[in-house]
Amino acid sequence: MRLGRRRPAQAAPGAPRLLVPFAGGHLDPAVLDAALRIARADGAVFVPAYLIIVPFSIALESPLTHEVEVALPLLEAAELRAQNAGVPVDARLERGRSLRDALRRLWDVERFDRILLPVSADERAGFDERDIAWILMHAPTETLALRPASGSVRERVAR
């Protein structure tokens, strides 16, 4: 009998990659659940990517301690959920001058087979309607947009 941490799921060589970009200090649990279901069904690697906006007033590579302190617990929680679901995970942290710039930088250096775009009714929580339209028009691969319903079954059960 093994005690301790479960071994991370291993991706098959050349496995598809499912990108889930997010920002604003939050990843909706319903989006995370959907991403893990899709990744499991496709035999894909789940790639949660926290996007950090770097103001023009500082260098792009400047240390952003506060933003990283917000991002890391979210990425670690997503990794743990993926590990518990038996889904391979490869988390990312990407910087840019805007959310679009950060995504463009990520797309320039990595291959993704599908993108699951979290959409929130609260634009302060991440992508606004202009970002969403831009992503749908410029994404290098199949892109799904998911906006969880308010008052969903999950929310009612959690109360």
Please describe what each predicted stretch is:
Residues 28-32, 99-100, 128-129:
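Amphipathic coiled-coil/heptad-repeat helices and related helical stalk/stem segments
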Residues 1-8, 34, 108-159:
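Gly/Ser-rich helix-loop-strand patches that form or flank binding pockets
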Residues 7-65, 90, 138-149, 159:
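Small/aliphatic-rich secondary-structure junction motif
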Residues 93-102:
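Charged docking surfaces used in two-component/phosphorelay signaling
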Residues 38, 102-106:
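CheY-like receiver
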Residues 31-34, 74-77, 102:
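Well-ordered alpha-helical segments embedded in enzymatic catalytic cores
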Residues 1-11, 63-71, 78-79, 83, ...:
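Extended, non-globular alpha-helical segments
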Residues 28, 71, 96-97, 125:
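A conditional alpha-helix N-cap/helix-loop micro-motif detector
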